[in-house]
């Protein structure tokens, strides 16, 4: 864990894209969209879901994260920020803001418990309870960029349990470290605004030996109680320039 270091500094790039999900001709004929007819030219296909989406807003931020262990202190210095899109179409107030705060928390699978949507999830590599909670399947041997990895799929032992499902890509060497992870959660009646959530992460080993997340992509499909009923929010994060001095 890099936070065991006395001092830590790194650069962080974040991009959040809010899109209308499952776009149809009927939706584009809504009075809200008739005011901006050029939008139909921006309809695209989501690579992860295969659904038609219409990007509405894009927010980007570049920042520097500074962490000190003792006394405990963390500071975020925003170095650049940009917003683009048609926010006037999606004036959903604090409702959407609260939903995004619940969804887009940082995921650390190296912790025994991962908290998302106000629920604790057992990490698929938890040293405490993963073996008893999940069932694992060795699926394939493949390359992740230049690294030979084993693909291991996992799902809760009990289908009734609320846990992650997905794939781990484990380094095929003596370290057995996680090279990449793709995890998702099922829909649930008491988390009714989230229809689907996927998290994809890439890990790298620093020259100093620590394992860090260098890129993360989180995709959340939501159901809103407004005229925009289905939205997709994608958050992409890239971290670089790790410094411990």
Regions found by a protein language model. Name each.
Residues 145-153, 177-182, 210-215:
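Short, hydrophobic/aromatic-rich segments at coil-to-beta transitions
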Residues 184-186, 191-233:
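Short aromatic loop motif centered on NTY/YTY
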Residues 163, 172-184:
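Surface-exposed extracellular loop regions of Gram-negative outer-membrane beta-barrel proteins
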Residues 141, 157, 173-174, 186:
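Solvent-exposed coil/turn segments that connect beta secondary-structure elements
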Residues 1-151, 155-163, 225-245:
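Structured extracytoplasmic
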Residues 3, 166-173, 198-208:
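Extended lipid/amphipathic-ligand handling interfaces
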Residues 62, 179, 197, 204-207, ...:
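Extended, regular secondary-structure scaffolds
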Residues 134-140, 165-167, 184-186, 198-200:
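Short structured motifs
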């Amino acid at each position: 864990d890099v936070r065991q270091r006395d001092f830590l500094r790194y650069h962080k790039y974040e991009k959040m894209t809010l899109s209308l999900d499952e776009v149809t001709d009927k939706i584009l004929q809504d009075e809200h969209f008739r005011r901006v007819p050029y939008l139909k030219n921006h309809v695209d296909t989501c690579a992860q879901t295969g659904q038609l989406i219409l990007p509405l807003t894009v927010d980007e931020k570049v920042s520097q994260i500074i962490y000190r262990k003792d006394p405990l202190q963390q500071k975020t210095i925003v170095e650049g920020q940009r917003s683009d899109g048609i926010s006037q179409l999606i004036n959903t107030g604090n409702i959407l803001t609260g939903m995004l705060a619940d969804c887009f928390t940082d995921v650390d699978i190296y912790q025994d418990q991962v908290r998302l949507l106000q629920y604790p999830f057992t990490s698929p590599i938890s040293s405490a309870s993963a073996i008893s909670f999940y069932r694992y399947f060795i699926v394939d041997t493949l390359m992740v960029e230049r690294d030979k990895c084993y693909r291991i799929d996992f799902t809760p032992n009990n289908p009734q349990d609320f846990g992650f499902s997905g794939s781990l890509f484990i380094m095929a060497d003596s370290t057995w470290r996680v090279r990449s992870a793709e995890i998702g959660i099922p829909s649930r009646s008491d988390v009714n605004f989230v229809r689907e959530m996927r998290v994809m992460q890439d890990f790298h080993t620093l020259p100093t030996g620590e394992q860090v997340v260098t890129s993360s992509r989180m995709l959340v499909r939501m159901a809103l109680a407004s005229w925009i009923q289905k939205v997709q929010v994608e958050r992409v994060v890239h971290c670089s320039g790790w410094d411990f001095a």
